[in-house]
Amino acid sequence: MAEPVDYKAPPYERTALRISTMVITCHWGTPIHLDVLFDQLPPIMIPMWYPDIGILKFEHKNKVLGSSHKDIFTNRKITPKSFFNQSTLVIRRMIHEGTDRAGWKEVNVKLFANGGIQMTGVTSEEFAYQSLEWVLQTIQTLPVSPFEGKASLERFSVQLINTDYALNQFINQDALHKLLVNEYNLSSTLEKTIYQGVNTKFYYNTFHSGNGICQCENFCKG
């Protein structure tokens, strides 16, 4: 009878930590009439194939102008849930310009009727701010201003930063989840449906040891 083989996993190599995406909020400093903006955008929008920066898509209520890279691969045109006080603008910008990493980047910009702005798909504050400056300058060239008053970029703020790194090895998610819960007593859930992965909450508090466990007496949001 053959003796059992003592399997040892190969060593992993962790890549450098990188910022994958950020969520930015800002404000025009004045309300904006989204219907007026929708009516004036068609002449200045660019098609998907056009190799330059520009506005690719504008989604307002149940209407849509243009298309984005994501639409082509998902066969989606209009968001299932449409809100009448907001619109979605998809712009194409050059990222890492002047370097060997230069390329096109599509950015989603949500515009709210009260003047609020939410931007996703950006990787740096500088790129986000420059993109919003470009959007403002572009809107200001329209024959009729959709803004109620003088617009500017106000309350620019980073709301969320997503980072990631790779181990370049297969991860046994079931075993990892059990290890985090049973061995380290961390808050963890194992997702096996649409967005597969191990969702772990590591609570950080400067007043307690870095074991990742919430020290609050009552349930909190971390």
Please annotate each region the language model reported:
Residues M1-G222:
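Intrinsically disordered, low-complexity polar/charged tails and linkers
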